[in-house]
Amino acid sequence: MFNSDVRSLLAVGIDLVSLASSAKRVGYQVYAADYFGDLDLQSICIKYKSVIQQKPAKSCGRFELDFKPEVFLRLTKSLLQENKIDAILLSSGLDDYFDILCELNDLVPILGNSPQTVESVREKPKFFEELKRLGIPHPETAMVTDVKEAKKIAAEIGYPVVIKPSRGFGGMGVRIAKSPQELKREFQEVLVFDNSILIQKHVNGAHASISFLASHNVVKILTINEQLMGVPYTFQSEPFGYCGNIVPFHSANLISERCEHIAEKIALHFGLIGSNGIDLVISKENVPYVIEINPRFQGTLECVERVLRIDLVKAHVNACVHGFLPMMQKKNLTFSTRLILYAPERVLVPDLTIFEEARDIPLPKTVIEKGEPLCSIVTEGSSRDYSLQKAKKIAKSIYGTLSPVSNL
């Protein structure tokens, strides 16, 4: 159990603005070991270190080429040389790098799931074997290393199949194959992301997620969320790339009981604690199929806070340190949308702080490469459509401010 006197927190990962903001809002001293080094994160933190050093007229590079998880260790060590930090809060990016998590945890304790617990829910296909034992719906999954083995497994599972890297996040490198010919072609594309590949039965349905909090013996669903994947109007180039979310999921009432059962069974069986997420596909029969666990803060963070009017970092600390979960008050139904925008071409970015709803804001006059993250937008409204249309309208305005840049 953590010492209850936690005052300073280090946010670590690639999606930190909302997490750092939530921590600062309730009085914590906030530090960050970040990837992008965005403008709004700099203004929140006492001190931060980032992989990318954003500068006017300089490219922010390409994530898939520049992302190296071990760099977060170096950034953390650098911050610890001059600052006293009590605990780490994890965002996305390091879920599948268990050695890195262990080393981070040795430097500063991770407030939340231990590296061993993270490994137990992220190591596939062992995790899916446990789900089968628990009777939790999930797509049939196998790990392969070559296309011959992939074809054999796909024939046994039955087409269509999903091909994905065994390690990754944000839907990067995920493909669908409807035949052995497609499998051969798509397999080579996925190999770029990882040498170990998952072949998974494709479940046709709506992409969703569960956000929940857990203490050592109690689990509470916060929200069921709609996931936005591969949305064309955000210029996301990956077919299953994460483009944001809408909270809550529009048909949440039809699946809430099943989702509660799934979250409780998984959290208690694996010993999950604090803020966690479960990615799902909801079939046409309204059966939630578990796709993966996100055993740390999720990209839905600010939307969940807006809908429930809670502070998620405070709730996470209370769950992990004190063992209690927040009371949920009945409120008027609010919908909150987060859109992640990607560069439609190589662009020069203006000052995006003029957009109140913009988050993850790059420094003015930096260069963003085609298909790379540009910024995100968070809106809310009394209906799903109003919230989404508001976000799309702001996205259109932001895209209108960008200036194309040549590759010279």
Stretches found by the model and what they are:
Residues 1-122, 126, 133, 145-152, ...:
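ATP-binding N-terminal substructure of ATP-dependent carboxylate-amine bond-forming enzymes
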Residues 10, 150, 314-408:
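Peripheral (often C-terminal) accessory segments that flank ATP-dependent C-N-forming ligase machineries
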Residues 127-132, 199, 316:
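Structural element of the ATP-grasp superfamily
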Residues 137-139, 160-162, 174-209, 224, ...:
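Conserved ATP-binding module of the ATP-grasp superfamily
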Residues 144, 174-179, 212-215, 249, ...:
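Short beta-strand-to-turn element immediately C-terminal to the catalytic PLP-Schiff-base lysine
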Residues 204-208, 212-271, 294-318, 330-331:
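ATP-dependent carboxylate/phosphate-activation module, predominantly the ATP-grasp catalytic core
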Residues 214-219, 283-286, 321, 344, ...:
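Short acidic-glycine loop/turn motifs at beta-strand connectors
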Residues 272-285, 328:
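A short glycine-rich, hydrophobically flanked beta-strand micro-motif that places a catalytic Asp/Glu
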